[in-house]
Structures are given as structure tokens and as C-alpha cells.
Amino acid sequence: MMGRVLDLGCGTGAQTFVLAKHIPGTITGIDLSPDFIDVFNARAEKLGLQGRVVGKQGSMEDLDILFESVDLIWCEGAIDGVGFAKMIDYWKDFLKPGGYVGVTCPSWLTSDRIEEVDEFWIQAGSGLDTAACNVGALQDAGYISVATFALPKTCWTESYFMPRRAAESGLLKKYPDSDAVEEFIAGNHYEESLFNEYGDRYGYVFYIAKKI
């Protein structure tokens, strides 16, 4: 029974409200952005979930909750910016014995690393480790690995790149003479080109583990 769930780096709650359909108990979404949290709570109210799902502004690196009070910590697409090994070790104290973490993190799927890709992700603020390395970090932190699997490429192409392309069109119309916007978009397209060429070697990986 999942009595208490944290969704860290929840954004506006896209995945949180999917979780709420499948998991009983309370879910607290935490995000640094107050604007995201406002949207999150408005969505919860619209769905009639405000008594069970609530968003709070805060940092996944500084949780203001009791130790061993959480059944599941969920984090999609946010852990890599602050450090996989660092965060899973920190979060463990807040999980009940036998509690779970479920996180996604961009990872190498092979030991055959590409320097150009590594450099891009380091510049972006989050270097890539191999999936095997991250599983090892979970075990070192005191978890049992339950499942590890790569998300399909469509999660990048259809759910990330395509919506971003649409947003880029709006930016260009709003700021037609902005060098900063053009540089930003060029960086986006470079990221896409790397994934198109090397996407068989790296991708987002889902890690599910249980606290010992």
C-alpha cells in the first residue's frame, strides 16, 4: 500500500496525475517553480483531487519532511541536473524501510561512449553515466534494484523534440531579431542531431529500486 508519495521536480504534474490514477494514498508534488506549482494545484482542484494531491514549492535537495515517512519517491527527468548518486543517497533517509524510488535519468546504454555526446551533456550541466554505473550507485546507497529499462525513442522524438520545435516557432515570431533566441534554437537542433545519430547508445532509463 502506497500511503505517501513524493513526486520531486514535478513540474505542472503531467506524470503526477497519472500516478494518482494508479496509486492510493496522498501525493505531494515538489518543484522549485512557483508558477508550475500554481498550475499543478489548479489542475488538482479541477480533477477533484485537491484533498489527495497537493503541490508545494521546494527543492528536492532540501526536503522538509520527517525521516522514514514516505512509501515512494518519484522523479522524472530531474535527477540528472543535481546528481544521481547524490540524490538517491539523500532521499533514502526519507523512505520507510522497504520504500521505493522510481526515477528516470539520461544514461549510456553501452560502454562505447561518444566523446561529442559526453561533452554536450557536461555543458548542459549533467554528465551521462552508464545504466550499469547507476544501478551500482543504487546498490551502494542501500537499495535493491527492482527494474531498469530504457524508455522508447518516441519519448524523445514525440514527447520532447516535437513540442519543443513548435515552441521554437513561437519564439522566432515573438523575437525575430534575437541572437540569443537563435543561439538557443541552434543548441536545441544540435541536441536533436546527436540523438538522431547516436540514440541507440544513450537515452532516458527508468530505475526502480527498494530501500533495504
Where are the regions that the model predicts?
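A short SAM/SAH-binding and catalytic strip from SAM-dependent methyltransferases
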Residues: 72-85
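A short glycine-rich, Lys/Arg-flanked "PGG" loop and its adjoining helix->strand segment in the class I
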Residues: 86-100
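Class I SAM-dependent methyltransferase SAM/SAH-binding core
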Residues: 12-62
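Conserved class I S-adenosyl-L-methionine
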Residues: 2-11
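Short, glycine-/aromatic-enriched active-site segment of Class I SAM-dependent methyltransferases
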Residues: 106-125
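Short alpha-helix
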Residues: 127-142
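Conserved Class I S-adenosyl-L-methionine
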Residues: 149-212
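A short acidic, Gly/Pro-enriched loop at the edge of an enzyme's catalytic core
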Residues: 64-72
